[in-house]
Amino acid sequence: ECATVPVLVEFWRPGCGHCQALMKELAQLQGELGERVLILTMNVDENFQIPAELEVSSLPALALYRGGSFERFIGGLGKKDEIRSQLLIG
């Protein structure tokens, strides 16, 4: 289904400390932005097809989707203000 808002997907793996830290930042960002963005997480051990197609090589990775299509990976991992600025919505 095609979302009408930007969608961020964090690719993560259990036991990855940086992944857990990013999840906390993303939860705060979701709270601040509400319905202006949809933030999802994907465990690469359970769902490996999409990360493989995107050639995810390190974790955590944060992918931006618009209109249902992959747009790009975004930086600022762990810094919600940097992530927000790359979304151009807040």
How would you label these PLM feature ranges?
Residues 18-33:
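Typically the conserved alpha-helix immediately C-terminal to a functionally engaged Cys/Sec
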Residues 44-52:
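Structural microenvironment flanking redox-active thiols in thiol-disulfide oxidoreductases
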Residues 16-19, 62:
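The canonical Cys-X-X-Cys-His
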Residues 28, 53-54:
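Chalcogenol-based redox active-site neighborhoods
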Residues 58, 63-90:
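Non-catalytic, surface beta->alpha helical segment in thiol-disulfide oxidoreductase systems
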Residues 8-9, 39, 62:
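Hydrophobic beta-strand anchors of alpha/beta hydrolase catalytic cores
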Residues 2-14:
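Short active-site neighborhood of thiol/selenol oxidoreductases, capturing the structured segment around
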